[in-house]
Amino acid sequence: MSSGSDEVHIGHPSGSRACIHLHGAHLTSWKTATGQEQIFLSKEAVFKPPKAIRGGIPVCFPQFSDFGQLTQSHGFARNSRWSVFSREGDTVALKLTSADDNFLEKYGWEDSFSILIRYTISEQQLFTTLEVTNTGGKEMAYTMALHTYFKVEDITKARIEGLYRVGYLDSLDRREMKTDENPHISVTGEVDRIYLSTPPTVRIVDPIGKRVVMIEKFNLPDIVVWNPWVEKAKRTGDFGDEEYKEMLCVETGCIKPAIRLLPGTMWKAEQILTVINNGSVV
């Protein structure tokens, strides 16, 4: 493991490695033992705090999108500088607390908290654990998501499996509640959906990349599927015009309803990404 003033690198004996920025506790790269990059990072990404980094795994806390009282979309965790809490083997943990900045003055957030994120890599897996503690004297309500940008070789060929007949809020249609009747999700245009009460495991199938990414999650009931497609990609300053073709966001989180955490209690969740390389993936 190596570290600098702004980022931490972790490695595994198999050859897998990852890079995490202290700004946002933001993982920007994860390569498995084969050397294949699993995470999309825009070539136009701006590394100038407090701006959020485009791509990687942004940590949306204490609010996902506008699901909360803050005017700041996706909260402030991804815009804040975290500190290294611990390092051991192939693992790094980073921490952010309400004492680290004036979140009340900057964002209007009143509650006291600490949030710990732990990244661990193995040959073909990335484990992400989150622990949120209410350090204040009253109940704290929040929403959150791990806004993972997955790299795919061709968005028109990739698909998501495991959300058949799961209800979702369509953010492109006034968040109308709908149900997906397709056995798998293929992206053929802009998509922005919040799937609620989802199964514990879903899969991204990337046939051109000859891989499957299995997403396992614990205490993260909701999944967001997002791709900006052509026009929105062109309107986004820190995103390449053609980059929508090589990314797919599948974001695990707790969005609706919000988590309500009593004083002195902790909430814990985990996401496990497993890459299966298979030349016969279709």
List where the protein language model places each region.
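Short, hydrophobic/aromatic beta-strand segments
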Residues: 29-31, 138-144, 282
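Extended, loop-rich substrate-binding clefts of extracytoplasmic carbohydrate-active enzymes
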Residues: 71-123
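Active-site/ligand-binding surface loops and adjacent short beta/alpha elements
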Residues: 139-141, 149-224
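Hydrophobic residues embedded in beta-strands of well-ordered beta-sheets
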Residues: 8, 27, 92, 126-128, ...
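Beta-strand-rich recognition/accessory modules
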Residues: 1-16, 23, 33, 97-102, ...
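Asparagine-centered strand-capping/turn motif at beta-strand->loop junctions
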Residues: 20, 130-136, 275
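Acidic-aromatic substrate-binding/catalytic surfaces of carbohydrate-active enzymes
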Residues: 13-72
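Beta-rich strand-turn-strand
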Residues: 123-126, 136
